[in-house]
Amino acid sequence: MDTFAQAIVMGIVQGLTEFLPVSSSGHLIIVPALAGWDDPFLNSLAFSVMLHIGTLAALLLYFQSDWRRLIPAGLAALRDRSLDGDGDRRLAWLIAVATIPALMFGLLLNDLVETRFREVGLVAVMLVVGGAILWLADRRGSRRLLEVDLTFPKALA
């Protein structure tokens, strides 16, 4: 299979796994290894980032009406220093707060992500561990969370 066809397959893998409770990044590392593809570009962090940028573009486009509501609401809350008013102000800031842990981990673990976390064996083990954690959370966790139940500490968690 040529590199272009492999890239198409990788794009499909990214599209299918991004919205499931599995690691799309992990699958982007596992699939070439299982398929025996050794193209350095397809196995690169740069290619993985490009696929994720494509996913981001698709999300921004699909949810554009929500973003057009939430961004001005979040900015208005910042300007007025108040979450009072419509629920969009609060939701915009809950989303912003929920991104903080990922941002911090990304900054702190950048070097590891670029090197060690791209090793196939480690990725396979972490996918199994992540699956076990999701299974336990599904078995023991609450099944229902309404928007009114969301708090800033829960957004951070």
Task: Label each PLM-derived region with a short phrase.
Residues M1-A157:
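Multi-pass membrane proteins that catalyze or facilitate reactions on polyprenyl-/lipid-phosphate substrates
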